[in-house]
A protein has these predicted regions:
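Activation-segment/catalytic-loop signature of the eukaryotic protein kinase fold
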Residues: 109
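Catalytic-loop of the protein kinase fold
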Residues: 158-174
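Conserved activation segment of eukaryotic-like protein kinases, specifically the C-terminal portion
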Residues: 198-214
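Activation segment signature within eukaryotic-like protein kinase domains
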Residues: 146-147
Length: 257
């Protein structure tokens, strides 16, 4: 059950307009942010289109019909629900401090209705996956431009000891100006100055795009840019050929032909 259109959050600061996507761990809404803009004419109230992601671990929770509060089915489920909610909040707060022209901007992280929400900028456009579904394989110059832009975004987060760990066409948006933007850091990891993991994450794999290190959770306990670089290469292969790459675990275990 989704939040209804017109539902308000943060005491009226945000208003839900409609659902734009959902998965096993969350629901994404388009919304409106009511804010003030100061200028030569004084302070003006304005509405800014935004995207709001709601943490909703659907296998373990449900929504009350009248209050819209998110409830967990069992105490066992509560442990997992809370664990990943805290991880989501922690990673979103990190991203709220990361500003790059090829990464979606996080505006705010907050808790309400028994769950967590991330308010972020709304990017008019479509994902590379949607573009491929509509147009087929993409021209090489266009692919190289997008890959270069996402590579710049990855270099930026890697310098801050952050791994994305889910690079794939559906997590790259192309905005109305034709610029690539990296989204969905839901399974990302952050590392300390000694390059040791400081945040745990669920083991989530996008087959064909995940590096072999990601098949063993210990493979990403120490910082290395290799998983993201592999996934970016797999994404480029997919965009140029229209084919999903062979899973890295199979490439590593199969004898060479």
């Amino acid at each position: 059950m989704n939040l209804p259109n017109g539902h308000v959050l943060q005491n009226g600061k945000y208003r839900i307009t409609h659902v734009i996507g959902q998965g096993g761990f969350g629901i994404t809404y388009k919304g409106v942010w009511y804010t003030e803009v100061k200028g030569s004419l004084g302070t003006v109230q304005t509405e800014v289109p935004i995207c709001i992601k709601e943490y909703f671990f659907k296998d373990y929770c449900y929504r009350e019909a009248e209050s819209f509060a998110v409830k967990v089915h069992s105490e066992t489920g509560r442990v997992l629900f809370d664990k990943f909610k805290e991880k989501l909040i922690k990673e979103a707060k990190i991203l709220s401090e990361v500003h790059h022209p090829h990464i979606v901007n996080v505006l705010e992280v907050f808790e309400e209705n028994g769950t967590a929400y991330i308010a972020m900028e709304y990017i008019p456009g479509c994902s590379l996956k949607y573009m491929m579904d509509r147009e087929g394989i993409l021209p090489e110059p266009k692919v190289l431009r997008y890959v270069r832009q996402i590579g710049e975004a990855l270099q930026f987060v890697h310098e801050k000891n952050i791994l994305h760990l889910d690079i794939k066409p559906s997590n790259i948006l192309i905005d109305s100006s034709g610029k690539a933007r990296l989204i969905d850091f839901g399974v990302s990891k952050r590392y300390d100055i000694e390059q040791q993991e400081t945040s745990t994450t669920m083991l989530t794999l996008s087959k064909g795009f995940a590096s072999i290190e990601q098949y063993d959770n210990e493979g990403t306990q120490s910082f290395s840019p290799c998983p993201d670089i592999y996934s970016l290469g797999a994404t480029m292969y997919n965009l140029l050929t229209g084919k999903i790459p062979t899973e890295s675990i199979l490439r590593a275990t199969r004898p060479l032909q």
